[in-house]
C-alpha cells in the first residue's frame, strides 16, 4: 500500500510493514506534487487543488478533528473514496481546556490576577465566588470532545445537555486514546436536543460549549437570533471552528449584555487579524487555537493511523470514517 504523508512533525512512525510511506510538505501545491498515480492513501490536513487527478487514491485520512476542508472537494466526493479524520485524538486536552475556562470564569481568576497586579487585598466576601456545581452546560456537538467534556463536567456536578443530529442516545464508535474516556453509551446528558431545537436548549444554559464540526449547515450556528435566545449573561466557549459564530452578531450581543462572556480559541480566518475588534473586547478572551495542542500529538496520530491501516487492509470500517453524505455539504 502506497501512502503519502503530508505532515510537518516526526515521520518515524511504526506502520504495518507493507505500507510504503512517502513524505511531502503540507501545502496544497506540495501535496499535489507528491501524489503519484499509484498513491492509495493520503494522510494530510490540507487537500490538494480540486483539479488534482490521483487516479489510485482510495482513502484520505485528515489529521484534524473536523472535516470542513473535505466538504465538496472533488477527491473526497469521488465514488468509492473513503475519508476519515482524527476526531478524538485531542479529546482529553480540549475537554480540560473547556473545564479550565469555565473554572476561570466562575472562580474569577482574571480578577484575582488584576488584584495581585494592583497589590490589592479586598474583603473576602467582596470576592466570593459561586460553585460550578449545579450550573447547566449545553454541549453543541456530542462527539469525542463533547463526550469527554461531559464526563469531566458531570463529575464536578454540572448538569449537561447536548445537541446532536438526533435525540437517540447513541453509542460512540469513534476513536479515543484511552479506555474510560468520554461517554461511550451517550447516557450522561440530562437532555438531548436535535439541532432544530437549538433555541430551546440555549434558553436554560449557563455555558454554551461548541464542539460541533463546521459544515454549510452549522456555519454561523450562533447568529443574531440564536444569540438572542440564550439565557441572559450566559458564557460561550468555542473550541471547534471560528465559522460557527457570526462574530459581528456576537460583539453586538456582548455589548448589549445579552451574552456574558465569550472564550474563543478558534477564529475565521486564522491567525486572527491584528486589527480585529475581538482582541480588545472586554468580554472576549482570545486564545490562539491551542486547546488541542499537546506534546504527544504525533504519537496519537500514529496510533490512530496504524489502527485504521489494519482495518483498511482487512476490509473493516475505519475509525472516524465520515459518511459520504456529510461530505456533500
Task: Name what the model sees in each region.
Residues 1-41, 171, 177-178, 329:
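N-terminal glycine-/charge-rich "phosphate-binding" loop or analogous flexible N-terminal tail
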Residues 37-116, 129-130:
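Phosphate/diphosphate ligand-binding glycine-rich loop within oxidoreductases
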Residues 45, 63, 211-214, 239, ...:
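Short, well-ordered coil/turn residues at beta-beta hairpins
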Residues 80, 133-136, 233:
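Phosphate-coordination loops involved in phosphoryl transfer and adenosine-cofactor binding
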Residues 95-114, 154-158, 303-316:
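Oxidoreductase and adenylate-handling cofactor-binding alpha/beta cores
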Residues 113-148, 188:
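Glycine-rich NAD(P)-binding loop of Rossmann-like domains
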Residues 167-277:
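Rossmann-like adenosine-cofactor binding region
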Residues 233, 239-329:
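Rossmann-like dinucleotide-binding domain for NAD(H)/NADP(H)
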Amino acid at each position: 500500500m502506497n501512502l503519502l504523508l503530508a505532515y510537518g512533525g516526526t515521520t518515524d512512525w511504526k506502520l504495518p510493514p507493507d505500507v510504503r510511506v512517502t513524505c511531502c510538505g503540507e501545502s496544497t501545491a506540495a501535496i499535489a506534487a507528491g501524489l503519484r498515480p499509484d498513491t492509495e492513501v493520503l494522510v494530510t490536513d490540507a487537500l490538494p487543488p480540486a483539479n488534482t487527478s490521483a487516479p489510485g487514491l482510495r482513502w484520505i485520512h485528515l489529521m484534524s478533528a473536523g472535516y470542513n476542508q473535505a466538504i465538496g472537494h472533488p477527491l473526497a466526493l469521488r465514488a468509492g473514496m473513503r475519508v476519515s479524520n482524527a476526531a478524538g485524538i485531542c479529546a482529553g486536552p480540549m475537554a480540560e481546556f473547556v473545564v479550565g475556562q469555565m473554572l476561570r470564569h466562575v472562580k474569577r481568576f482574571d480578577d484575582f490576577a488584576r488584584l495581585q497586579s494592583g497589590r490589592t487585598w479586598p474583603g473576602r466576601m467582596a470576592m466570593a465566588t459561586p460553585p460550578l456545581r449545579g450550573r447547566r452546560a449545553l454541549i453543541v456537538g456530542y462527539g469525542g470532545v463533547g463526550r469527554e467534556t461531559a464526563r469531566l463536567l458531570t463529575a464536578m456536578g454540572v448538569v449537561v445537555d447536548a445537541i446532536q443530529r438526533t435525540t437517540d442516545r447513541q453509542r460512540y464508535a469513534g476513536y479515543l486514546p484511552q479506555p474510560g474516556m468520554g461517554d461511550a453509551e451517550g447516557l450522561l446528558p440530562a437532555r438531548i436536543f436535535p439541532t432544530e431545537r437549538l433555541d430551546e436548549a440555549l434558553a436554560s444554559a449557563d455555558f454554551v460549549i461548541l464542539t460541533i464540526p463546521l459544515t454549510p449547515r452549522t456555519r454561523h450556528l450562533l447568529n443574531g437570533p440564536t444569540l438572542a435566545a440564550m439565557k441572559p449573561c450566559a458564557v460561550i466557549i468555542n473550541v471547534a471552528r471560528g465559522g460557527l459564530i457570526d462574530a459581528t452578531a456576537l460583539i453586538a450581543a456582548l455589548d448589549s449584555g445579552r451574552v456574558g462572556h465569550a472564550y474563543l480559541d478558534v477564529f475565521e480566518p486564522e491567525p486572527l487579524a491584528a486589527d480585529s475588534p475581538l482582541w480588545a473586547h472586554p468580554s472576549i478572551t482570545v486564545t490562539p487555537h491551542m486547546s488541542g495542542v499537546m506534546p504527544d500529538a504525533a504519537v496519537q496520530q500514529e496510533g490512530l493511523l496504524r489502527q485504521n491501516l489494519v482495518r483498511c487492509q482487512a476490509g473493516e470500517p475505519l475509525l472516524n470514517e465520515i459518511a459520504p453524505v456529510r461530505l456533500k455539504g
